[in-house]
Amino acid sequence: GHKHHIYHWLTPEGDKILEGKSGFLNPKFYCIWTVLTIGLWILLGKKMRSISAEIDNKPLNVEEGKKYVYKTTVWASLFIVWFALTVASTTPWLWLMSIDAHWYSTMYSWYTFASTFVAGIALITLFVIYLKNKGYLELVNQEHIHDLGKFMFAFSIFWTYLWFSQFMLIWYSNQPEETIYFKPRTEGAFTTLFWTQ
């Protein structure tokens, strides 16, 4: 079929770079790692949701409450570690960076992690403002919303720093194997979109 139009590494024959990356970039590893990653995200998310539902459905005394706090902390910690490991390393490499498999960047996974984090904080902030305006979240005040804004601003700066650092290093080195990523984005049909990101 035409699978190789997205992932050129599916047909690495005759390409020494793609053949060298075939231990990581191959259909079997891609499928297993994708199923494992998403599967664990779902399982850990369902477990945390079920614990939360248990807490909501019955009154607790102090000792039971402490047990649930510990339980939720353990499961949330496991999820955060798994999510960070996958979103800050393997997932961006495998799903996104491998679209252009000749190009690589050690900063790319951190860049995608920071952009995911900024998007998450922005979405949380919008939900908090919406729910606050609807009369929910009575304990949330302007300081909380301001803190969310500061947090979002800080990670936006971090995201921008990573993007600029990656772009500047690739631009300055002017190596063909590195500029291959930016050339079609800065000179092609996506120029405006690229510079407004």
Predicted segments, located by residue:
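Transmembrane alpha-helix boundary signature
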Residues: 1-10, 47
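Long, contiguous internal "core" modules enriched in hydrophobic/ aromatic residues
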Residues: 27-197
